[in-house]
Amino acid sequence: MKQNIKKIYEIASVATICTALFKKGLKNQFIQGLSPLNKNISKMLGLAYTVRYIPAREDLNLIDVFKDPNHPQRVAVEECPRDYVLIFDSRKNPRAASAGSILITRLMVRGCAGVVTDGGFRDSHEIKNIN
């Protein structure tokens, strides 16, 4: 994101940005019902890098799938560009554990601007204390 544009977004409210998008024909460009884990962070800003989860089949999605380095969740964590916000679209399913403290820490080390989910996080008590 260009620095001059970033400075504008840093001072604009979410409502203002949503209205501007709406005027451009982009409706429903936000996720409802979100709340920050860390209440001390006032604003998170970055381009979106989105991963969409689909419901897992318990007969096919065994724990071994997470050992695969090409698992979509791992790929997203490694490919999310610096200064982007990783968005986990979990279809508003809190049982879809989007990530835990290890992956969130990895994203932080890689320079990710933040993480958003409409699902759940494992280790949320640890994630909210990650600096």
Short names for language-model regions:
Residues 1-131:
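Feature captures the catalytic cores and cofactor-binding loops of soluble hydro-lyases/lyases
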